[in-house]
């Protein structure tokens, strides 16, 4: 269980000590599609980067169904530039630009945002109703998160404005410094690219480092996703991963809106009452 405290900032670099930053924004987009929420957030991020004087570049991966190859190709393209940071943002993530920019205030190698899973946490909704949470606030209590805290037992109290060490995080929102890939290059395998990339991230026969792959974790026999595999490889050589608990991210997905008319509560517009099939028709009596 995670208990968040709202307190003052800590661990933030002073302006004179901040290194020059140039960020490479990378988004895999299967089908070449992204959400409007992502687009709106990205435009605001661009304005925020310009206001801070942070140069940026962007690269997108279209129509690549294999997410491991998509991420590796984007990293391959990033390493050809002089950018200092790679920022993965998936095309179904909504974010606040100001909260994201706060990640740059901490000189950390790997930092990720924590976003909810694409499901409604009905247990949390029920609990919130019993606690008297107002109806207009219930949407803030519907999320399910996976937070992989490092070495904890029971309830942990952390500061909401301070990076939180985790053993793994999702690449749907992850900021990675260039030196991470440079160090991992010595320990991860390479493969020969045999896919035509219309976005120009990689050419045929390019040698691409496999930073992202699926793997089986020896200790638990779990199948690790590509982002957890990446985090494991980084931790194996002494690296650390941090989460940004101050970020409030949205994870856009599809949902079937359903219900039984006879069981729903009337809306403020006062829905008409529905009579059961065997009830007499008042108009005919």
Identify the meaning behind each predicted range.
Residues 55, 92, 109, 240, ...:
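Residue-level detector of anion-binding/catalytic polar loops
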Residues 75, 96-214:
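Conserved catalytic core of nucleotide-sugar-dependent glycosyltransferases
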Residues 2-65, 69, 281:
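N-proximal low-complexity "stem/linker" segments adjacent to membrane-targeting elements
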Residues 50, 104, 234-235:
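Anion (oxyanion) recognition and catalysis
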Residues 67-71, 143, 227:
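Conserved donor sugar-nucleotide recognition element shared by glycan-biosynthetic enzymes
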Residues 5, 14, 18-20, 24, ...:
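C-terminal catalytic/acceptor-binding lobe
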């Amino acid at each position: 269980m995670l208990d968040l405290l709202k307190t003052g900032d800590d661990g933030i670099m002073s302006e004179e000590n901040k290194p020059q930053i140039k960020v490479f924004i990378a988004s895999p987009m299967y089908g070449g599609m992204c959400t409007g929420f992502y687009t709106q957030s990205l435009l605001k991020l661009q304005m925020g980067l310009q206001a801070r004087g942070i140069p940026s570049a962007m690269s997108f991966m279209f129509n690549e169904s294999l997410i491991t190859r998509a991420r590796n190709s984007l990293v391959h393209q990033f390493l050809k530039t002089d950018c200092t940071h790679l920022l993965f943002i998936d095309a179904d993530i909504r974010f606040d630009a100001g909260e994201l920019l706060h990640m740059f205030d901490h000189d950390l190698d790997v930092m990720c945002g924590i976003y909810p899973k694409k499901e409604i946490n009905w247990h949390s909704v029920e609990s919130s109703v019993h606690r008297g949470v107002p109806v207009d606030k219930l949407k803030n209590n519907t999320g399910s998160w996976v937070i992989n805290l490092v070495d904890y037992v029971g309830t942990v109290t952390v500061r909401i404005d301070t990076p939180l060490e985790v053993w793994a995080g999702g690449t749907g929102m992850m900021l990675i410094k260039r030196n991470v890939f440079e160090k991992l290059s010595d320990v991860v395998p390479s493969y020969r690219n045999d896919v035509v990339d219309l976005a120009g991230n990689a050419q045929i026969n390019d040698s691409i480092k496999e930073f992202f792959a699926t793997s089986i974790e020896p200790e638990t026999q779990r199948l690790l996703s590509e982002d957890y595999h990446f985090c494991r490889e980084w931790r194996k050589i002494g690296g650390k991963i941090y989460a940004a608990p101050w970020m409030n991210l949205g994870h856009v997905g599809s949902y079937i809106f359903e219900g039984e008319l006879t069981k729903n509560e009337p809306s403020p517009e006062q829905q008409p009452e529905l009579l059961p099939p065997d009830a007499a028709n008042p108009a005919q009596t």
